[in-house]
């Protein structure tokens, strides 16, 4: 079963060509997951009050079409079967019934006081569960050792990047990645 929310795309989530950025898409799917957590429990705020935080480990996003300012969209999210300390979650974004984007993610649940990871089996929740997505790009890949890497820039994490958990919100990574 999937949790779905309806949105109108904000103009501030678009670029110079009026196309929604990767970060914009990430914001809608994150908000949808936040709504699911609030509706089914435990909520993001409840986790925060318990000294727990979900931290992203891996994210794969496939974008099949463009979104523009003021488009009416539906974002869906669902938890997937998870084991160990890896919490799996998937997302989709549709406009007029057409799939525009999909994402698959792996999260860790952290005890913020001790820094210890919390096992799936030690985290009771009511989040709806459905089948995982099969994306055209796996969230598990390694760069070959012979690929040359070079520093292309540096970025300081600023106040507006940081969320309630005291770390850079995962939706900011899209802007950083696309900015270089």
Q: What does each of the following model-derived ranges do?
A:
Residues 1-56, 102-104, 111-180:
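Hot-dog-fold acyl-thioester-processing enzymes
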Residues 12, 82-83, 94-98, 108-112:
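Short coil/turn motifs at secondary-structure junctions
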Residues 89-95, 106, 119-123:
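"Short basic amphipathic alpha-helical interaction patches in structured regions
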Residues 59-96:
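Hydrophobic beta-sheet segments that form the core/acyl-binding groove
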